[in-house]
Amino acid sequence: MELEVADFDLPSAIDNALILVRERASRRGITLGHSVDERLGPIRGDERKVKQVLLNLLSNALKFTPEGGRIDVSARVHDEVAEVSVTDTGVGIAPEDQEAVFEEFRQVGTADKKVEGTGLGLALSRKFVELHGGRIWVKSELGTGSTFIFTLPVRREE
C-alpha cells in the first residue's frame, strides 16, 4: 500500500469530513463540534487516506453515540506534529478491548449491541496513519465515551 503524497490543508480536510457526516448526526440529534489550532495549515501526506481516517473515526463515533449525544473533533500542532482527536459521548470501550479495536475484523462490546460494519475501519486507519509516520490510539471509559487520537508529522514541501 502506497501513499500519494502532496501538500494539503488539514483544517479543510477536517471540515470536509464533518460536512459528510453532519446530516446523519443531525437526524439523531447528535451535536458536532470542532476546534482547530489556527497554526495548523498545510501538511504533506496522502489527503485521501487522511480523510478516510477522519471518516472512519467520525462514523464509529456516530454508531456508538446515543441520540442527543455529542462528537467533537479537535486538531492542534506541537513539536512539528499534528494531533487530531475525535471525542464522543458514546458507550465507551473497556480497557481490555482498547487495543483490540484496531485488529482486522474485530468488533468489541456486548453481543446484544450488534453494529453494522466489517471491523476493518480502525485497522485501516491505523495502517494509513502509520504509513505517514504517525500513531493512533484510544482513550476510553465505559459509559462515558471515547477519544480516538492520531498524530501526523507536519512536513511541508521545501
Regions found by a protein language model. Give the residues of each.
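Short alpha-helical Gxxx[C/S/T] motif in the catalytic ATP-binding
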Residues: 121, 125
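Short beta-strand/loop element within the Bergerat-fold HATPase_c
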Residues: 68-80
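Glycine-rich ATP-lid/hinge loop adjacent to the conserved G-boxes
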Residues: 106-116
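Short helix N-cap motif at coil->helix boundaries in the Bergerat
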Residues: 10, 92-100
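Conserved catalytic submotifs in the C-terminal HATPase_c
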Residues: 4-9, 26, 31-41
